[in-house]
Design a protein with these regions (language model features):
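C-terminal-biased regions
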Residues: 99, 105-112, 123-165
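Short coil/turn linker and secondary-structure boundary residues
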Residues: 3-6, 30, 98
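Short linear motifs at protein or domain termini
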Residues: 1-24, 144-147, 151, 155-165
Length: 165
């Protein structure tokens, strides 16, 4: 499947439709185990930025964990089906040198709102996160860099200094 500008915009639009509603439900329904799983994915993202590693796979675990935490079987199945597409979207949005470090606090804001059981804040934070990813994708598209293949393995980040708080 070829990645076109239109395809990526459609995918971001789908994310704006599904993820904020899923995160809203997660803020109401997440179990302690759900939160621990999402925290672990977040920690993996932070580790990848600070010490190098696979940011994108942890990013995918984070988002899929949030959708699993909504405890809606249809949303969970959709999340599984979209996994490869989301991974590719994350590969593109994190291909900017400062992309992962910029998006990490936005992820934290979503997670903190879910932990606080604040559905409105969780939904707003999710929309901000998706808007940031959309901006990153638009900048990558404008740069005319080669887009990753859907079949390519996740890129690994090099260590970044200093550590992120």
């Amino acid at each position: 499947m070829g990645l076109t500008r239109e395809f990526l915009r459609d995918l971001q639009e789908l994310r704006r439709v599904v993820e904020p509603a899923g995160v809203r439900l997660a803020a109401q329904r997440a179990t302690a185990q759900d939160l621990a799983d999402i925290e672990a994915a977040y920690a993996g993202m932070k580790h990848a930025i600070e010490q190098g590693g696979d940011y994108v796979s942890n990013d995918l675990r984070f988002h899929q964990g949030l959708l699993r935490a909504c405890h809606n079987r249809m949303v969970v199945q959709m999340s599984k089906a979209l996994g490869a597409l989301l991974r590719t979207s994350f590969e593109i949005s994190t291909s900017r040198p400062d992309g992962p470090a910029t998006s990490l606090p936005l992820h934290r804001a979503v997670l903190d709102a879910v932990i606080a059981r604040n559905p409105d804040q969780a939904e707003r934070a999710c929309l901000v996160l998706i808007a940031g990813a959309q901006d990153d994708i638009e900048q990558v598209l404008a740069s005319r860099r080669k887009l990753p293949s859907l079949a390519a393995p996740a890129a690994r980040l090099k260590a970044r200094v200093p550590p992120i708080p």
